[in-house]
Regions:
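Conserved GNAT-family N-acetyltransferase fold
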Residues: 65-70, 79
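Short amphipathic alpha-helix that is part of the acyltransferase structural core
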Residues: 1-40
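Conserved beta-hairpin
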Residues: 41-66
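Long, contiguous hydrophobic alpha-helical segments, chiefly transmembrane helices and signal peptides
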Residues: 18, 79-81
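Acyl-donor-binding surface of acyltransferase catalytic domains
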Residues: 72-76, 83-134
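Short, well-ordered strand-loop elements centered on a beta-strand within folded domains, enriched
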Residues: 5, 77-79
Length: 134
């Protein structure tokens, strides 16, 4: 079980937990889960308008298991789930809460990973563009 919460500002401890989560995901996936704009907003050097979503385990020893960032200016969301807690419905629960509350218009998925594809399919999302790294 976990607790999903919505924030306009994050405490330093939450920022550190998100950064650690993103690092674990990047190591597992070999691609960063958040783009530069999201990283800057997380660090307080980007958009002050973003909404942070935290999914925290009910077990304090585990801590943060999911994070999403919504930019309300364009309605886009970036979402990441801790690699050790994937395939448990965490991403879907987080995404569904964001959809119900903030009505995003687009989602970013980096690396075209199977988990992101499965989540997008489950939510009825379709690919509208792709990025090629050359």
């Amino acid at each position: 079980m976990s607790l999903i919460s919505r924030h306009h500002d994050l405490r330093d401890a939450d920022k550190a937990a998100v950064t650690a989560l993103a690092t674990r995901a990047q190591q597992a996936d070999r691609t960063p889960p958040l783009n530069e704009a999201a990283q800057l907003a997380l660090a307080g050097r980007g958009s002050a308008h973003v909404v942070h979503w935290l999914d925290t385990s009910s077990d304090p020893a585990i801590g943060l298991i999911g994070y999403a960032q919504l930019d309300p200016r364009d309605g886009s969301v970036q979402l990441v789930v801790d690699p050790d807690h994937r395939r448990q419905g965490i991403g879907r629960a987080l995404a569904e809460q964001i959809i119900a509350t903030d009505h995003p218009t687009s989602w970013w998925a980096f690396g075209n990973l199977p988990g992101a594809q499965a989540l997008a399919s489950a939510l009825g999302l379709t690919v509208i563009r792709g990025l090629l790294i050359m």
